[in-house]
Amino acid sequence: MTVYRVVLAEEAADDLLRIEDFTIERELASATTDLGVVRRLRDAVDRALRLLEFSPYSCRKAARALNDKQRELIIPFGSAGLIAAFEVRGEVVRIGAVRHQLEQDYH
């Protein structure tokens, strides 16, 4: 069994920080603020990324993929979720971008 090494590109790491900020802003604007939301977000991302260590090809092919190595991981979270765009190169899974499904530029 191949164990893949998961690597976050700098852009993807920046995306995750931006998504945390986005999540905090949405939560602070809600009527019932939940301060544990960021911890749960991080846990959801960590769990999902661990899947890529063992089974990256179980994720869907990217919509505009140039080859079968470009994939998307759906990360369920709350009423929406996140999409992590990644590419498999040998035994390395490189995550290039992460988007929240409620962001304006998601579509």
Feature-to-residue mapping (PLM):
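Enriched for short, Lys/Arg-rich terminal
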Residues: 74-107
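Basic, Lys/Arg-enriched alpha-helical interface segments
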Residues: 1-71, 77, 106
